[in-house]
Amino acid sequence: MSEMMIVAVTGGKGGTGKSTLSANLFFYFIENYKTALIDCDVETPNLPYLTGCEDLFLAREVFIEVPNIEEGKTYNYNNVCKEGALLKVGDKLIFIEDLCSGCKACGINSNITFKKKSIGKIYEKKFDNGYLIVGKSNLGERKTAKIVTETKKYGLSKNCEINIVDTAAGTHCNVVRALINADKVLIVTEPTPFGVSDAKRIIKVVEKLNIPYKIVLNRYGISDLKIGYNFKIPYDKRIVECYCKGESFLKYNDLRNYIEEIANWIIWG
């Protein structure tokens, strides 16, 4: 294992159990390794609940810079906004703040000035041998890319031996941002038609990024659907009970074995 291992846990669709896997891997690793659990699902972070840690403290706020358009002022706008956040109507420049990503391209060769806008926050919880780092977008915020980037950056700044990055579901840009620079990827799926279909999509993304990956079949046993996998986690009532309580299921030795098998691949390959 390298000095700093980054493993991303992802899945093509929501609800497959990737965050449950991330949380239990975290509790397994902190027994012997300094570990960071980084929640990059910034629009719907749920690792605080799955780890029983709702008492996080605010580590930092995430800002972007947006145009400061003043009423009655004339601007020599360069018409480069790909998001459509700036519209020229006659001599008037209209700014639609919700569409702005903060790229500041509109300020090139222009008299447009900028102001800070808060788009989200990063929260932290310290454990004896690790950290839970959680990015969370402000309510209604549409442009959340920088929150993902800053959350991951802040988590990695803790210099932990193991870094578990929990991504959002899907194959969109924020998922890619969370996956970039990972040493290994765990793709979590389930034996359902949607699970198989969406797993194929995220596999293509991970292969494009050229990152080694393994497939974890969660809820093994709920159907006879055939799907290739490397590791499995069975459908078990005890896992559901632990999930609802925000607890790890590692206390059950037979279930712990499934996590240990995955952890061994992360550490030893």
From Swiss-Prot:
Record protein name field: Uncharacterized protein MJ0579
Family: To M.jannaschii MJ0578.
Superkingdom: Archaea
Organism: Methanocaldococcus jannaschii (strain ATCC 43067 / DSM 2661 / JAL-1 / JCM 10045 / NBRC 100440)
InterPro entries per record: CobQ/CobB/MinD/ParA_Nub-bd_dom, P-loop_NTPase
The keyword Hydrolase belongs to this UniProt entry's keyword annotation: no
Keyword field contains Nucleotide-binding: yes
Keyword tags: ATP-binding, Nucleotide-binding
Residues annotated as binding ATP: 12-19, 130-137
One Pfam match: CbiA
GO terms assigned for molecular function: ATP binding
Cited Gene3D superfamilies: P-loop containing nucleotide triphosphate hydrolases (3.40.50.300)
